[in-house]
A protein has these predicted regions:
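Short, Lys/Arg-rich flexible segments
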Residues: 1-185
Length: 185
């Protein structure tokens, strides 16, 4: 799974020994249940806009918030691609990975600096009531000018969405206990 992910591993010798004695493939059902729960829990963080530790995500920069077209009040959500890109994968008898394969998933999870190289661009502007305004491609009467945008750095704050909260930990234990209880019947 490309992008970023969190791995959950069952490392309890008693549970693993019990799995080894079962006729069922080890952990197949419980690992899928854990993966489904963790995927759902991770997706829910986009509604609460909080990290697994319960802290609020850092707010949007005012300039970006002002020009954001969709979901203006939502952090890490423009069209929902990051949230809908959360998936889980059972990778072993006792392991589930939860993550996203979107190319920008890691920068949002961990934060960091994005280096933007210098580039050429065409700027379109128009004048209205003595003010200079940017104009779209189709705007008639706009003046075009080629400009050089210098190299610069964009600093992205970490807004962790992957991880296990205290509530997740309790639910994981409940799912495993429920599953172990069902094996004993």
């Amino acid at each position: 799974m490309a992008g970023t992910h969190v791995t959950f591993t069952v490392d309890d010798r008693a549970v693993l020994d019990m799995l080894a004695r079962q006729a069922l493939p080890p952990g197949s059902d419980v690992m899928n249940r854990l993966g489904e729960y963790l995927q759902s829990s991770t997706e829910a963080r986009f509604k609460t806009q909080t990290a697994p530790d319960g802290s609020a995500w850092q707010p949007l920069q005012p300039r970006y918030a002002k020009r954001k077209k969709y979901a203006k009040d939502k952090i890490l959500t423009l069209r929902g691609y990051l949230r809908s890109g959360i998936h889980y994968q059972v990778t072993g008898d006792a392991e589930v990975q939860v993550g996203s394969n979107t190319k920008y998933a890691a920068i949002h999870q961990f934060g960091g600096a994005i280096e933007k190289p210098a580039r050429q661009a065409i700027v379109r502007y128009r004048s209205e009531a003595g003010r200079v305004l940017f104009a779209g491609k189709k705007h008639q009467g706009a003046t075009e000018r080629q400009v050089t945008i210098p190299a610069h750095q964009v600093n992205m704050p970490a807004r962790p969405y992957l991880g296990i909260s205290a509530a997740d930990d309790a639910e994981i234990r409940a799912i495993i206990l429920d599953w172990v209880s069902s094996l004993r019947k």
